[in-house]
Amino acid sequence: MSRYRGPRFKKIRRLGALPGLTSKRPRSGSDLRNQSRSGKRSQYRIRLEEKQKLRFHYGLTERQLLRYVRIAGKAKGSTGQVLLQLLEMRLDNILFRLGMASTIPGARQLVNHRHILVNGRLVDIPSYRCKPGDFVTTREKERSRALIQNHMNSSPNEELPKHLTLYSLQYKGLVNQIIDSKWIGLKINELLVVEYYSRQT
C-alpha cells in the first residue's frame, strides 16, 4: 500500500489530530458525532484506527510500518515503546519535531532534495535513523537556509521535546537522547497497534 496523498482533513476528521500530516485540527465534537453515527465500534476497528493514526502521522506505507513493528518485536523492552522510539528517531520526524519543517511530508521533501546534513554529511534518506549525539544541520546554501527559516517562522512556538535541542541561528539541531514516551507528539495507544499486527499473523 502506497503512502497517503489524498485529502488530509478527511483523515483527521475520522482519526483525530495528526500533527505530522497537517497542522489542521478536527472541529471540536466531530469525532463524537462520527462515532455516534456509526454506532458501537468493534475491537478490530479500534485497533485498525490506532494503526492508521500511526501510519498517517508518520507518513509511512503499510509495508514500512509492518517492518518497524517486526524490528520492535525483536528488540528488548516493550514492543510498543520501541516502535514509537524507532519512528520518532527517523530523520524526517526529527526535522519536524525541531520545527525545521511544518509537517513530516515537508521534512521528507527537504531530505529528498538534499538540503540536510547529519554530522556534516549529506543524508537524502528520510528514514535515516538518528541517534544520541547526532547534529542535524542545513546545507550552507541560501536556498536551503531560506526554506528552513520559512518553516521555523511559520511553526507554532511549541515546547521542544527534551530529547532535542535547537540552535535556530545556526540552523542546527542536536539529538540529546532516545525520546521518552511522554514526549511523543501524537495521542496514540501503541499497544493496540501491536495487537493489530499480532492478530494479522
Curated annotation (Swiss-Prot):
Q: Tell me, what is an example of a GO biological process annotation in this record?
A: ribosomal small subunit biogenesis
Offer an example of a GO molecular function term for this protein.
rRNA binding
Q: Which UniProt keywords apply?
A: Chloroplast, Plastid, Ribonucleoprotein, Ribosomal protein, RNA-binding, rRNA-binding
Which residue intervals define the domain S4 RNA-binding in the entry? 89-150
Query: Matching SMART domains, A to Z?
Result: Ribosomal_S4, S4
Q: Which InterPro entries does this UniProt record tie to the protein?
A: Ribosomal_uS4 (IPR022801), Ribosomal_uS4_bac-type (IPR005709), Ribosomal_uS4_CS (IPR018079), Ribosomal_uS4_N (IPR001912), S4_RNA-bd (IPR002942), S4_RNA-bd_sf (IPR036986)
Q: Name one GO cellular component term.
A: chloroplast
Among SUPFAM superfamilies, the record links this protein to: Alpha-L RNA-binding motif
Highest taxon of the lineage: Eukaryota
Q: Where in the cell is it found?
A: Plastid, Chloroplast
**Pfam families referenced in this protein's UniProt entry, alphabetically:** Ribosomal_S4, S4
Major localization listed first in the record, in broad terms? plastid
For region Disordered, the annotated ranges are 15-43
CDD domains on file? S4 (cd00165)
Q: Per its UniProt record, what HAMAP family does this chain match?
A: Ribosomal_uS4_B
Record family assignment = Belongs to the universal ribosomal protein uS4 family.
What function does the entry list?
One of the primary rRNA binding proteins, it binds directly to 16S rRNA where it nucleates assembly of the body of the 30S subunit.
Summarize the subunit comment: Part of the 30S ribosomal subunit. Contacts protein S5. The interaction surface between S4 and S5 is involved in control of translational fidelity.
NCBIfam families hit by this protein: PRK05327.1, rpsD_bact
Report the protein name in the record.
Small ribosomal subunit protein uS4c
Tell me which species this is from: Amborella trichopoda
Q: Which gene encodes it?
A: rps4
